[in-house]
């Protein structure tokens, strides 16, 4: 059907409103587009900054010196009951030790030629060679008088730790990283078990990891080095570890404490192995022993031995006060052990080759809690 043309006057009356509506629609579109662009700018403007911060975070996390720095991430923890005199950061520590423990061998795995393990708790010493140190003690194998040592350990720490600092405060490392523990649940060891291993999930590195994690959880920025300084050759291991520590100190001058974490080796003439043990909160742990060197004026040059001794005493006092029976007496002797590098350099023996790995892992956690208390002012 053919449409009729509208009269001119009527057609003009429809066209004008249509053009006005079109103009209004166009204006609204322009306004909407401008508003959308402004909103997008507001949303996306922070993204370059966020991307930069993310990249910097990744770069910081990936930074490592050539000696394989590993900054241990702290495990999840929840508040636990603790002595009110301890720093809040230590009171809040639980750090589920179950997260670290390994399956141990049962009796069905015991070989016919298995060796014997003898458990023993080493008490604190008494007599002229021993200086009381809180609930603990110091065994004096030097010519320093007991009165001199007793007076020295009453002095404050020669350094202060910065809690929650972005800069490393503590270095955990291992001169004899390949030292390991027995893997049996019973009091026996297979030939070769509890001697040496390059497996860092089984040797001293595993214990050091627990120590570092616990300190980090307490707000003490801690690095953990897993260099196998005694592999492939045991000879020269202290020269190797000295170079490693010097590299860390040059890169991170904020480090105040260097812990060389080892295990002991105590056995009978017949080859049976002693396991230094104690019980803490219903769980068996390896006992620990701090070794602090002294300058003898000739072959052992440790001009800062007094500062290290103060640190050893504070740590011993803290650990034995928190966990009675956990420590053996501090060994104060003419030993070098690279303890000239800082005023907070110590060696700690965590158990011995007669202990199983789980006892040592638990001891590492307890030792670190005691250290955190000492460093944060709760000793």
Outline where the language-model segments fall.
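N-terminal Lys/Arg-rich, disordered targeting/topogenic segments
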Residues: 1-15
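N-terminal catalytic or cofactor-binding beta/alpha core of small enzyme domains
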Residues: 20-256, 265-270, 365, 373-379
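Structural recognition of the beta-strand scaffold that forms the well-ordered cores
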Residues: 171-174, 222-224, 257-260, 289-292, ...
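Solvent-exposed loop/turn segments at secondary-structure junctions
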Residues: 177-180, 228-232, 263-268, 295-298, ...
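A short, glycine/acidic-enriched catalytic loop
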Residues: 190-194, 266-304
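Alpha-helical scaffolding within the catalytic cores
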Residues: 245, 270-278, 330-336
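Active-site-adjacent substrate-binding region
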Residues: 304-331
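Active-site-adjacent mobile loop/cap segments within catalytic or ligand-binding domains
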Residues: 325-379
């Amino acid at each position: 059907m053919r449409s009729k043309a509208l009269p001119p006057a009527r057609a003009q009356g429809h066209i004008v409103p249509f053009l006005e509506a079109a103009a209004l629609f166009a204006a609204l579109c322009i306004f909407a587009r401008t508003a959308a662009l402004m909103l997008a700018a507001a949303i996306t403007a922070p993204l370059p900054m966020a991307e930069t911060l993310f990249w910097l975070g990744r770069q910081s996390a990936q930074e490592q010196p050539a000696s394989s720095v590993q900054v241990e991430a702290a495990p999840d923890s929840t508040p636990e009951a603790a002595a009110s005199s301890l720093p809040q950061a230590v009171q809040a520590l639980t750090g589920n030790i179950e997260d670290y423990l390994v399956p141990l061998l049962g009796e069905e795995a015991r070989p016919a030629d298995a060796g014997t393990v003898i458990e023993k708790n080493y008490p604190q010493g008494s007599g002229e060679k021993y200086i009381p140190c809180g609930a603990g003690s110091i065994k004096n194998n030097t010519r320093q008088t007991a009165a001199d040592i007793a007076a020295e350990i009453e002095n404050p720490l020669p350094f202060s730790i910065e809690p929650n600092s972005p800069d490393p405060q503590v270095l955990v490392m291992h001169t004899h990283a390949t030292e390991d523990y027995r893997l049996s649940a019973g009091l026996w060891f297979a030939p070769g078990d509890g001697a040496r291993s390059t497996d860092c999930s089984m040797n001293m590195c595993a214990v050091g990891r627990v120590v570092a994690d616990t300190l980090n959880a307490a707000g003490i920025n801690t690095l953990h080095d897993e260099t196998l300084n005694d592999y492939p050759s045991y000879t020269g291991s202290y020269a190797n570890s000295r170079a490693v520590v010097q590299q860390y100190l040059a890169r991170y001058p904020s480090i105040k404490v260097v812990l060389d974490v080892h295990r002991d080796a105590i056995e009978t003439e017949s080859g049976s192995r002693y396991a230094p043990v104690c019980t803490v909160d219903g769980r068996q742990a390896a006992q620990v022993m701090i070794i602090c060197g002294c300058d003898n004026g000739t072959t052992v040059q440790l001009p800062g031995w007094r500062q290290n001794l103060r640190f050893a005493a504070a740590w011993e006092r803290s650990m034995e006060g928190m966990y009675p029976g956990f420590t053996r007496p501090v060994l104060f002797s003419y030993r070098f052990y690279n303890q000239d590098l800082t005023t907070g350099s110590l060696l700690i023996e965590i158990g011995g080759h007669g202990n199983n790995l789980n006892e040592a892992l638990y001891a590492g956690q307890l030792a670190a809690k005691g250290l955190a208390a000492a460093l944060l002012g709760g000793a």
